[in-house]
Amino acid sequence: MLMLELFGAARCPHTQEMRDWLEFRRRDYVEYDVELDGAAFSRMCELTGGQRMVPVLVEDGKVIQSGWQGHGCVVDGKSHA
């Protein structure tokens, strides 16, 4: 199985829901808080074509899910100057 990357934000309940789902499915993943990690925020924006909504789930360098069940939290990237 390929490694998953979860781009999210601690304050976002939808990130928590995706995290819970991944753990329930026993999937290994690396998580990045894009509000604390400027490099992760930039990478997420590159992968999504500039989208600033979390959570974003990436597998093998490709976005496989954006948002959680049609919902997400907007992040602005200003918290990690």
Region locations from a protein language model:
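Local sequence-structure signature of Cys/Sec-based thiol-disulfide redox active-site neighborhoods
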Residues: 1-28
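Glycine-/small-residue-rich active-site loops that bind phosphorylated ligands and cofactors
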Residues: 13, 36, 64
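Thioredoxin-like thiol-disulfide oxidoreductase module
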Residues: 34-50, 77-79
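Structural micro-motif
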Residues: 48-58
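Non-catalytic, surface beta->alpha helical segment in thiol-disulfide oxidoreductase systems
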Residues: 59-81
